[in-house]
């Protein structure tokens, strides 16, 4: 399970939500457009990892839960974002109507935080094989691929950094729900890589 610490994925995910993540899917299939994925920080997008006090009783319990895989390792910083582009895709912001385009197809994004634009940052990128381009649903509050183009991977996330696909909000119970996959992105034609 993973904890949502920020509002970068609102309104799909709320601060404090706990989500179920399918880690096995990342081992056998590549991420698809529209999926919400958890991934390890590819190049210090979050800055340096926080130092924790391991001497307290609670810290020892948490450490044990990390060891058996129930909790994520806090020393490994994780992010959660929506996959917009996969290897071979061309992603552009924005078309004449202000929508993102993937492989020349303008997409509807009903999951974007109300009042946000698809992006205030213009870009035209080609996603290389073995990488994804990700964006938070709360575009004005998400430090995602758009804001990390000067990093080692030019804002892309290597597939090897993906921990799994977010599938279900499990806590609080009032938020219990499946996580949407962005159906409009499924309509985008696949570009064949040479």
Regions found by a protein language model. Give the residues of each.
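Soluble "head" domains of membrane/secretory-pathway proteins
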Residues: 3, 11, 15-194
């Amino acid at each position: 399970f993973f904890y949502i610490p920020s509002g970068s994925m609102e309104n799909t995910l709320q601060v404090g939500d706990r989500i179920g993540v399918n880690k096995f899917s990342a081992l056998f299939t590549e991420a698809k457009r529209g999926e919400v994925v958890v991934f390890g920080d590819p190049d210090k997008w979050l800055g340096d990892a926080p130092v924790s006090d391991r001497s307290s009783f609670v810290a020892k319990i948490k450490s044990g839960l990390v060891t058996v895989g129930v909790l994520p390792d806090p020393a490994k910083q994780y992010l959660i974002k929506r996959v917009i582009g996969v290897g071979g895709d061309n992603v552009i912001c924005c078309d004449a109507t202000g929508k993102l385009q993937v492989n020349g197809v303008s997409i509807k994004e009903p999951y974007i935080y109300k009042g946000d634009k698809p992006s205030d940052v213009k870009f035209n990128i080609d996603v290389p094989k073995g990488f994804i381009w990700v964006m938070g649903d709360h575009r004005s509050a998400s430090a995602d691929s758009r804001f990390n183009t000067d990093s080692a991977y030019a804002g892309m996330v290597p597939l090897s950094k993906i921990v799994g696909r977010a599938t279900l909000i499990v806590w609080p119970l009032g938020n219990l729900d499946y996580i949407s996959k962005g159906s409009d992105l499924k309509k985008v034609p696949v570009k064949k890589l040479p």
